[in-house]
């Protein structure tokens, strides 16, 4: 019986309970999902904040850099030449534009400023252009004008309107001096050198030791090309300066027009002296003046 | 159904986080490059 009864003992493994338990463990509860969602949302928020902060910092830094580059560009333009082309917006990283959302700095304002400045510079240069005419020896074929400054030749070209070449010089007295001159023989009179000066020297005239005899005689043109600037600049020279009307110079092509002026002056003085000494009235007056002076001196000494 | 919705939302936010992390990395890279340039 016991054996039979023992055979009635429930020997089932009750596996269904286990299966149920396992199924519950595989599917996370809704609360866990909600927690996970909250966690990722918080992370998302934190990332967004960090990104915003980083973008702000980046924008500030970028703005500083742009300002610095603009400033250096402007100083470069002031000193030398037209600016380099601005970096094309296409070259800007699309990401930085999109993410940073920074308004790309408009280059139109800078360009306008630059154009205005350039125009002003051009007008200043135009104002200071002066033309000076120098008389040279007919045999002299060089394009060298001795005006007291040192010049460095940087070019020469043949122009259509004039058969003689035009030489370009830059002032070599000071590195910062931007004065340039063009020298070309006059079409009307090949013995006249036409020097066109652009700008104004920012330094005093170099030593005039060698300049006393070596300077060309300059002729200021009677027309409108000659400016007071040129006249003032030349008047500072210690050499005899003659102002000759070009209309006259056209007519006078004889060798007398090429006489050296110091010689003429010397001749005039000699002529005046000889004519005075030959005049008996003058010698008598001179003798009277001298004796009178001597008499006066003797009288006061006594 | 609610769990599915939650799971979808988690996936979406995770994907967004991944993108944000990538963007942040790039901005950081640019920032430090610019910073080095300035220095």
From Swiss-Prot, chain A:
The keyword Cytoplasm does not apply. One of its GO terms (molecular function) is DNA-binding transcription factor activity. The keyword Transferase does not apply. Keywords: DNA-binding, Nucleus, Transcription, Transcription regulation. PROSITE patterns: WRKY. GO terms for cellular component: nucleus. Disulfide bonds: none annotated. Residues 140-206 bind DNA. InterPro entries: WRKY_dom, WRKY_dom_sf, WRKY_plant. It is found in: Nucleus. SMART domains: WRKY (SM00774). GO terms for biological process: defense response to bacterium; defense response to fungus; negative regulation of DNA-templated transcription; regulation of defense response; response to molecule of bacterial origin; response to salicylic acid; response to wounding. Belongs to the WRKY group III family. Transcription factor. Interacts specifically with the W box (5'-(T)TGAC[CT]-3'), a frequently occurring elicitor-responsive cis-acting element. PANTHER family: WRKY TRANSCRIPTION FACTOR 36-RELATED (PTHR31429), WRKY TRANSCRIPTION FACTOR 40-RELATED (PTHR31429:SF3). This is Probable WRKY transcription factor 40. It comes from Arabidopsis thaliana (Mouse-ear cress).
């Amino acid at each position: 019986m016991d054996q039979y009864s023992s055979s009635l003992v429930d020997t089932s493994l009750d596996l269904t309970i286990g299966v149920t338990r396992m199924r519950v463990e595989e599917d996370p509860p809704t609360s866990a999902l909600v927690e996970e969602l909250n966690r990722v949302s918080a992370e998302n928020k934190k990332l967004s904040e960090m990104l915003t902060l980083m973008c702000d910092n980046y924008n500030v830094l970028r703005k500083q850099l742009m300002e610095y580059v603009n400033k250096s560009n402007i100083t470069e333009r002031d000193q030398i030449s037209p600016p380099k082309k601005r970096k094309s917006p296409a070259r800007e990283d699309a990401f930085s534009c999109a993410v940073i959302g920074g308004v790309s700095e408009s280059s139109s304002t800078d360009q306008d400023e630059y154009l205005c400045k350039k125009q002003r510079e051009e007008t200043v240069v135009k104002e200071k252009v002066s033309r000076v005419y120098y008389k040279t020896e007919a045999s002299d074929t060089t394009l060298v004008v001795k005006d007291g400054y040192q010049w460095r030749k940087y070019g020469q070209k043949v122009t259509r309107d004039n058969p003689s070449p035009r030489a370009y010089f830059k002032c070599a007295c000071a590195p910062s001096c931007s004065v340039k001159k063009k020298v070309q023989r006059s079409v009307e009179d090949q013995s006249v050198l036409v020097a066109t000066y652009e700008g104004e020297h920012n330094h005093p005239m170099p030593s005039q030791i060698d300049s006393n005899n070596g300077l060309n005689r300059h002729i200021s043109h009677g027309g409108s090309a000659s400016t007071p600037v040129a006249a003032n600049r030349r008047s500072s020279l210690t050499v005899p300066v003659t102002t000759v009307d070009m209309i006259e110079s056209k007519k006078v092509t004889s060798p007398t027009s090429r006489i050296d002026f110091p010689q003429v002056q010397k001749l005039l003085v000699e002529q005046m002296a000889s004519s005075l000494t030959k005049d008996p009235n003058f010698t008598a007056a001179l003798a009277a003046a001298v004796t009178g002076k001597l008499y006066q001196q003797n009288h006061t000494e006594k | 159904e609610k769990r599915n919705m939650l799971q979808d939302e988690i996936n979406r936010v995770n994907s967004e986080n991944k993108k944000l992390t990538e963007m942040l990395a790039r901005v950081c890279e640019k920032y430090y490059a610019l910073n080095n340039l300035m220095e």
